[in-house]
Amino acid sequence: MSTIDLTLDTFEDTVLGEGITLVDFWASWCGPCRLENRGYAELYERHRAAGFEILAVSVDHDARSWKAAIAKDGATWRHMADLTGWKSPLAARYSVTALPASFLLDREGRIVAKDVRGKALAALG
């Protein structure tokens, strides 16, 4: 697991030029988000060699809870947080008002799918 301090610049540096990136907004206190994490683990392992990345953006306030959830869920992909909760500029940029929320981005950072989950997400690979 790698964690990155969240700014709009670090976000863009992280997703641009990659292959397909799933940007997943979540929080340690969000039960459905935590279930999604477990489902992402298999998908990530299966497709990361082909350029698929997951960037999890937390809307947590507490770093300890955030990092503990990452470890417990076995979420080995990249994680970002600014620990401002719903005041996160990135959550505002993507108009995220409920969790879980996810966006599939192409290598130019364009949204190609929104809130794709489970079997529908696996079918895209």
Which residue stretches match the model-derived regions?
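Conserved strand-loop elements at the edges of beta-sheets that form or border functional pockets
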Residues: D5-L8, V59, A98
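Hydrophobic heptad-repeat coiled-coil signature
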Residues: C30-C33
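Conserved beta-strand segments of alpha/beta enzyme cores
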Residues: S2, E53, T76-R78
